[in-house]
Amino acid sequence: MAGTTPPDNPYIAARNEWNERYGSYVKAAAAWRIVGITGMTMAVIGFGYALYQSTQVKLIPYIVEVDKLGTAVNAGFPQQIEYADPRVVRATLGSFVSNFRSVTPDAVVQKQYIDRTYGLLRTSDPATEKVNAWFRSNSPFEKAKTATVAIEVNNIVALSNQSYQVDWTEFERDRRGKETATRRFRGIATVTLTPPQDEGVIRLNPIGLYLRDFDWTAQL
């Protein structure tokens, strides 16, 4: 008796035909989805890294020294220069003393003096603690209620590459402008150069000169 072939299942036949026609498209679509997800992930990682790098930008000043005719004779980044031009150091120290010791009735200007003073100080150095102690017991805002103090820097002498002697005179006047006292002081400042790391620091301390230590005494 001859064998009989069972009739084809129409559902199986339809599925096979669908697989043959569209299965490759489904696989290709799945592959492209994987590629798309991978690309998006890499884009997110790249954007995150770029954003992180943007927050790490450091502004480093480039110092150029010129002679009397304006010709450049030395240049470089602060970390490449062992010590700044002594004239620049002396001018910076003179400004520091004036900002530190001046007393004015204008509270806005007084705050600027204090900001400029701390622009040359670092929290870890002894000079900062000494200046803090002075301001704690000698508030310039309280002093300004009854008097003003003007500073005249008389002399700044280099004792070494890192230490300077500063002599100055303080003229105290009452609020009517009458001079009530004149005092002379001498300070010894030990300085160091550290490259500024952001724009805010550069505005207050463009060459990165910091006072590591600072002592001062009244002179007879």
From Swiss-Prot:
Q: Which InterPro entries does the record match to this protein?
A: NTF2-like_dom_sf (IPR032710), TrbF (IPR035658), VirB8 (IPR007430)
**One Pfam match:** VirB8
| UniProt subcellular location | Cell membrane
Q: Where is it found, in Gene Ontology cellular component terms?
A: plasma membrane
Q: Which Gene3D superfamilies match?
A: VirB8 protein
Q: What keywords is this UniProt entry annotated with?
A: Cell membrane, Conjugation, Membrane, Plasmid, Transmembrane, Transmembrane helix
Protein name per UniProt: Conjugal transfer protein TrbF
| Species, as recorded | Rhizobium radiobacter
Q: Which gene encodes it?
A: trbF
